[in-house]
Amino acid sequence: MAAEVQMVLYEDDSVQVQYIDGSRLQLSPCGSEFLFEKAPPVSAHPLQQPERIRQRTHFVISAYREQLQRALDFRNSFATCPFLSESIIPSEMKTRILIDVSEVRWPSLDTGDGMTYMQSGTVRISSLDGHAYLCLPKSQHEFTVHFLCKVSQKPDSSIEVSEKNNKGKKDKQVEKAGKICTRGSLSGQRLKNKENELYHQIMKSEEPSEKSCVNGAKGREVLSSPHPKDTCIYTWVKQCWSVASCPEEWKYPLSLALHFHDKISSMSGIDADITQKRMLTSDVSEERGKEVSVLPRALLLSCPAPHLHRWNFSDSLSQKQFGEEEYSYHELVKVVWYKGVTYRLTHKHMNSIEIYPGDGSVFKSEGAYLGNYFTYYSIREESEEREEKTYAVNNLPPDRPGSPFSVCSLIKQATRILQHCAKMRLSLSHNYRVCCWKMVPGINDSSVLPLLLRESFVPGVGRFLAYSDDKVHAIFLDGITLTLNWNFGSFIEKRQVNRGLTLGWCKLTFPDGQNQLIQIQHPRPYERYVTTVISWCRRLTQISQQEIPIHPSSSVPEESWSVASELEKIQKFNLLLESSGVLNQTSNKKNKQSLDRCKPKSSETLLKEVNEKSVSVALKKTSEILQDIDNLLSNSKW
């Protein structure tokens, strides 16, 4: 069986795996279906299509079971909702429990129960019921969580009936478990059961373990064997997350781990980076008091919307090397595993990436538009001192002999991933793709069609459109279209926020249909297009909230501030003055009072309204508008 070279997890939790022999495996977003594409033989014709096998995950044959299991393990480690097929999980990894484990309770911050400091410097926080625990290494850049999760179920009504039948027995089991828990304290004790033996192998801990209240789980497993119909099958799921982007359900135990690690460091006298810890704990310090975490639930065995599955087929005519080809799936990338190195991305307000070479160190993208600089964080084993280095993408150092990894190749690979995500964020389709497992009732799906916030047409320049998904489209008269991301949070949140650009890239579409991704800082020959759109966006964010339609009923061109509308106002004002003779009548007012009395009633009303003060104010506004026009022309360099 061929080994994996690259595994990619996308934002919709779909997976693509590339093997060393050229074969590929694709996993649907829900995990219930997969497509295996065999590598074509050497003697195959260039136009010959490779052999493809498409199967349900629950009914996978033995030829692809091991490969599919590793792909699912990779998916479940980083996905929002795991997919756990009972037919693929090994028997030693299954646990039968009578109660429904849907949430866990963590210890209080004031007590030291369930908190363990291991010899490797890792802090482990265990839940009071023993159904979950969190591990934070001494680097404090990422953490792992282990929790019990019920295997994927069939979408039928029999599950609801079985849950109702188990409701009465659940209370009795909880009562028994509570009595067992009162016999011992979790403080300074370790777990000891079948699952915890696996924990000790992973953590390589040499500390002696003692029995605790969680031993009741082992008793429940024995008790449940005579009544298999009344039990639920669970398995342990391991997930890895970044401290900088912690999910909501793990924020409280992470705050406990960070607090406990700081306490141990202060007692041992280890110098720590206080500034970095404050940055990491800024989002989790407010989680005190949220001791209960709702555990993620596994997806159903069968997909509710299999018609939404999309498969990408490789092109046999263009054989590219691994890691150098573009990602064929039109979706944002969440995690990439490439030759032992993990790349983790976040897409909240801007694209950022973290590189984990596997030795405990990490690279983080930095800079005004993330991706121009990378900061390297590591801890020396001898002195346990933190080391930080900053690398510029345009000036990477050469490879050093004997180094465990190439800094140049890692950062270049990360830059390619960021560029792919920039293309997807500037695409017109990725926000509108409907994910299959998000169609299940009860799961929030916030992906809706964007609303048109503002549309302006400038004669001689083009049309500008701003949407609620932070996209800006500019269609110039010469046929070139520019697309960029601009944060219009003030439109929806009813507050003035001028965060500006969320990407350091913009996309140009030429009249022949070709696209080009260019850096906004260095637009080169396309500077006039970029500066014109950015000026329009900056002016748009300065408009007051009262003038911004949150839900426009129609896409009527808005020209309240544009140059064309101001010029049109000036022309109308001059025409009004010329037709009514206001200037002549005002200058000769003292000499021609008799003629003024002969004017029609409408002219008398106009004379009273338009006096010398109003004319001076209008001229002052006209001069300001002309200055704005000059500044716009000088900046755009037409």
Curated annotation (Swiss-Prot):
Coiled coil: none
Top-level taxon in the UniProt lineage: Eukaryota
Pfam family membership, one: C5orf34_C
PANTHER family: CHROMOSOME 5 OPEN READING FRAME 34, ZGC:153352
Protein name in UniProt: Uncharacterized protein C5orf34 homolog
Species assigned in the record: Bos taurus
